[in-house]
């Protein structure tokens, strides 16, 4: 492809410029006598020539003949190679044979006018056709240049399209790669999110499990602390250091575990992690009782009653009443009291102890002194009795308990040991903290409560010490164990009018409680606990400004049972001070408990109790009525709902049935219509088939009639032909018969005549065979030829084999008739005569 435009000689170029165009020498006519080959056509050299190019422009051009370059100052034409598109045809032309190359416009004329021979060559510089050839060559160069430019444009456009496609493909690949990377990134992010969510769920699950475990541990710790506190009630008294009771008593009754020296903690942790009842009731009692003297003294002091129990008991006056009630009502349902705890120091295991399932020992502390350590006189005035009355004190409680004690002793050793191990471990961990808490709780209220409860009697220090125990309002309601022990510890009072009236009242109360309670054994303990809780809630208001009673672990009972257990305990308060044998020091102790005990009138208490019971009964009746009404409303609503659902279901079923029936009817109607349509189609098809059969039958009849008619016509023609043939044959036979008769008469041998006869018959049969293909109807048996074939047999050979006939002349005639050929245009009379005669002859032969 050229780098710049080419200058082409115009039509008016001078001859000098044209002469300077390099020309190749032509072969001389002398050197090469053979004429030059014809020039190669332009179409073979220039394939891109448009079809509408004139013939003058399609002459052969030399690839070396190029236009002038603009940079050539001399005006010479520089050779330039042709484009590759134009070389291929030239190579094809070269392969065909040597072709003369056009060297300039001088040779263009001879190549164009090769068909016209010219004797002389005209010079190019002088003749005007040379100028025309130069002009045409310029036009050809111009067209070639245009074609090259178009080709270049086409290639450029093609290359641009190809580059555009490449760019599009590259962009598509980039887009696909980006999309793939994006999807991979999204998948990775989703996987990370799922993994993070899974880790978060696992972490939350672990946290929940951890919280649940911690909550379970805390609950177990709280339960353990509750058990520890309930157990420590039996030996960890809450008496203050400066309590006058310790100074006046001078005995071990007021000693508390909190007031022990520091070196005793290890012994308490090891030996006294449980209550005294559990300790004395353990299976290894013989081994555990082998203590040193100092340890035995500690155990004895812990086993003795303390004044903290009086603070928890609310009043020293109510204790004998509850004690007598417990003493009379002790049985299988009653828990063992502290009175038997004193006897447990005797040899042999004491049977009446805390039930193993209670998980806590006997909470209350007996008011009596230990048998080893008798109490002093001031304390025995209101708690103890002389040693001579102790056997009488133990008898009422021990009357109905040996069987229960044996059952408990048989069922408890393993459970007690397990509970002992568990509590020992918990005690080792929490004993120090428990002592500090108990000490703080015991020392929190004495200063504010003591002035309110102070009196002028000798027991006023004890009265001050009673509310000082924080377990009165804080820990006592949480104890699952009743406190019937003081009643057994106090000595029985001598019979008195008021005492005797109080006992039946207690019996009546116990009977009512037994009637109201669902179970025979457990409800009494529950009633005692409820009565204690109710007593503490009511009197605690003047003593403590803001007490926080701990809820009882037992399920809450109705208000009627609480009131029934509360009121008789309050009414029994004034009964004890009026006893004649009661010490005079017990009388002032009633005064601080009166404002806390409620009403002192028995009738008023009975009336209040009846009123409360009536209100509770009315409340229950109202609640029951409301429950019934609500149940009726719910039942009615349910019934209405069920009725509506049933109606809706029935409507749906009826609608479904109607739809099914309608569908069945429509289906049956459609089937009937289909059957009718099929039947109609079948009938129409049958009618059409009958019509077609009738038409075919008629056509067959017509065809048969036509054939019959044609047969009749053929028979008539045949009869006519036979008539004409038989007429001539009859004449010949007559002549021949005459000759034979003459010969017979002359005496020739008849056998010879018979032998000579078949030759003529054979000749006639051959003629008949030649005529048979022309008339195929003759070979078939028909009514026209009764003598030719009868039942498929030809009678002629039978006559020939026999050699004679019954009538010689007739037989010869019959043989001659059947064997001879048919002759056209003969008379018909002889044939008719023969036809009439022939059937009898055949019958005779057969």
Curated annotation (Swiss-Prot):
Disulfide bonds: none annotated. It is found in: Cytoplasm, Cytoskeleton, Spindle; Cytoplasm, Cytoskeleton; Cytoplasm, Cytoskeleton, Microtubule organizing center, Centrosome; Midbody. Residues 130-224, 414-443, 599-740 form a coiled coil. The modification Phosphothreonine is found at residues 49, 53, 99, 120, 554, 818. One of its GO terms (biological process) is microtubule cytoskeleton organization. InterPro entries: MAP7_domain-containing (IPR051483), MAP7_fam (IPR008604). It comes from the Eukaryota. Residues 24-41, 479-497, 542-556 have a biased composition (Pro residues). There is a cross-link at residue 462 (Glycyl lysine isopeptide (Lys-Gly) (interchain with G-Cter in SUMO2)). Keywords: Coiled coil, Cytoplasm, Cytoskeleton, Isopeptide bond, Phosphoprotein, Ubl conjugation. Residues 1-153, 186-210, 318-816 are annotated as: Disordered. Residues 132-153, 407-437, 523-539, 600-740 have a biased composition (Basic and acidic residues). GO terms for cellular component: centrosome; cytoplasm; microtubule cytoskeleton; midbody; spindle. Microtubule-stabilizing protein involved in the control of cell motility and neurite outgrowth. Facilitate microtubule stabilization through the maintenance of acetylated stable microtubules. Belongs to the MAP7 family. This is MAP7 domain-containing protein 1. It comes from Mus musculus (Mouse).
């Amino acid at each position: 492809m050229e780098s710049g435009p080419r200058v082409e000689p115009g039509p008016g170029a001078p001859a000098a410029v044209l002469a300077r165009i390099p020309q190749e020498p032509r072969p001389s006519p002398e050197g090469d006598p053979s004429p030059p080959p014809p020039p190669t056509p332009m179409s073979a050299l220039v394939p891109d020539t448009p079809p509408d190019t004139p013939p003058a422009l399609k002459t052969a051009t030399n690839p070396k003949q190029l236009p002038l370059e603009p940079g050539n100052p001399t005006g010479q034409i520089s050779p330039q190679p042709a484009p590759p598109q134009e070389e291929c045809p030239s190579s094809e032309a070269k392969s065909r044979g040597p072709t003369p190359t056009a060297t300039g416009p001088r040779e263009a004329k001879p190549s164009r006018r090769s068909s016209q021979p010219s004797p002389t060559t005209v010079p190019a510089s002088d003749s005007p056709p040379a100028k025309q050839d130069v002009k045409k060559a310029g036009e050809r160069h111009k067209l070639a240049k245009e074609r090259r430019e178009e080709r270049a444009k086409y290639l450029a456009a093609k290359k641009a399209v190809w580059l555009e496609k490449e760019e599009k493909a590259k962009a598509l690949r980039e887009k696909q790669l980006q999309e793939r990377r994006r999807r991979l990134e999204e998948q990775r992010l989703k996987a990370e999110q799922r993994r993070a969510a899974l880790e978060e769920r696992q972490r939350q699950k672990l946290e929940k499990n951890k919280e649940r475990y911690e909550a379970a541990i805390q609950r177990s710790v709280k339960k353990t602390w509750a058990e520890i506190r309930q157990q420590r009630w039996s030996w960890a008294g809450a008496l203050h250091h400066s309590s006058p009771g310790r100074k006046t008593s001078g005995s071990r009754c007021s000693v508390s575990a909190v007031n022990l020296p520091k070196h005793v903690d290890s012994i308490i942790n090891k030996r006294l992690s449980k209550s005294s009842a559990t300790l004395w009731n353990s299976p290894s009692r013989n081994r555990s009782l082998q203590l040193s003297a100092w340890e035995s003294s500690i155990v004895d002091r812990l086993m003795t009653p303390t004044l903290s129990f009086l603070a928890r008991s609310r009043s020293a006056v109510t204790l004998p009443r509850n004690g007598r009630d417990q003493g009379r009502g002790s049985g299988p349902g009653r828990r063992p009291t502290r009175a038997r705890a004193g006897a447990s120091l005797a040899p042999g295991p004491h049977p009446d102890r805390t039930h193993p399932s209670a998980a806590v020992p006997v909470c209350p502390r007996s008011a009596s002194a230990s048998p080893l350590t008798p109490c002093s006189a001031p304390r025995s005035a209101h708690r103890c009795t002389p040693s001579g009355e102790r056997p009488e004190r133990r008898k009422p409680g021990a009357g109905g308990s040996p069987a229960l004690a044996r059952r408990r002793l048989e069922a408890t050793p393993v459970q007690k040991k397990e509970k002992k191990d568990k509590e020992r471990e918990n005690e080792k961990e929490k004993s120090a903290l428990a002592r500090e808490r108990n000490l703080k709780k015991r020392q929190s209220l004495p200063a504010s409560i003591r002035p309110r409860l102070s009196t002028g009697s000798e027991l006023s220090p004890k009265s001050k010490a009673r509310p000082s125990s924080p377990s009165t309002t804080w820990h006592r309601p949480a104890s699952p164990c009743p406190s019937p022990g003081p009643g057994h510890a106090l000595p029985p009072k001598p019979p008195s009018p008021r005492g005797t009236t109080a006992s039946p009242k207690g019996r009546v109360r116990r009977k009512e409680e037994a009637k109201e309670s669902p179970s025979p054994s457990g409800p009494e303990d529950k009633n005692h606990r409820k009565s204690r809780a109710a007593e503490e809630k009511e009197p605690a208001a003047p003593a403590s400004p803001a007490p926080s009673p701990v809820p009882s672990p037992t399920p809450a009972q109705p208000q009627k049972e609480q009131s029934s257990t509360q009121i008789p305990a309050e009414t029994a308060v004034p009964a004890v001070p009026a006893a004649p044998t009661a010490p005079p020091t017990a009388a002032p102790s009633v005064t601080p408990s009166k404002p806390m005990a409620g009403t002192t009138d028995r009738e008023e208490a009975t009336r209040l109790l009846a009123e409360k019971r009536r209100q509770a009964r009315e409340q229950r009746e109202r609640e029951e009525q409301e429950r019934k009404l609500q149940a009726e409303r719910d039942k009615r609503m349910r019934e209405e709902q069920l009725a509506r659902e049933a109606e809706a279901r029935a409507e749906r079923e009826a609608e479904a049935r109607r739809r099914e029936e309608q569908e069945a009817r429509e289906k049956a109607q459609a089937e009937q219509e289909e059957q009718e349509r099929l039947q109609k189609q079948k009938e129409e098809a049958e009618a059409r088939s009958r019509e077609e059969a009738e038409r075919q039958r008629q056509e067959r009849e017509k065809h048969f009639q036509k054939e019959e008619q044609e047969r009749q016509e053929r028979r008539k023609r045949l009869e006519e032909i036979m008539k004409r043939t038989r007429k001539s044959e009859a004449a010949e036979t007559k002549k021949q018969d005459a000759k034979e008769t003459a010969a017979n008469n002359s005496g020739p041998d008849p056998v010879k005549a018979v032998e000579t006869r078949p030759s003529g018959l054979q000749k006639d049969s051959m003629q008949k065979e030649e005529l048979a293909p022309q008339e195929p109807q003759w070979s078939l048996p028909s009514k026209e030829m009764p003598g030719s074939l009868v039942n498929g047999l030809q009678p002629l050979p039978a006559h020939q084999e026999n050699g004679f006939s019954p009538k010689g002349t007739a037989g010869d005639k019959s043989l001659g008739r059947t064997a001879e050929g048919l002759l056209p245009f003969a008379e018909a009379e002889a044939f008719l005569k023969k036809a009439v005669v022939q059937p009898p002859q055949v019958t005779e032969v057969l």
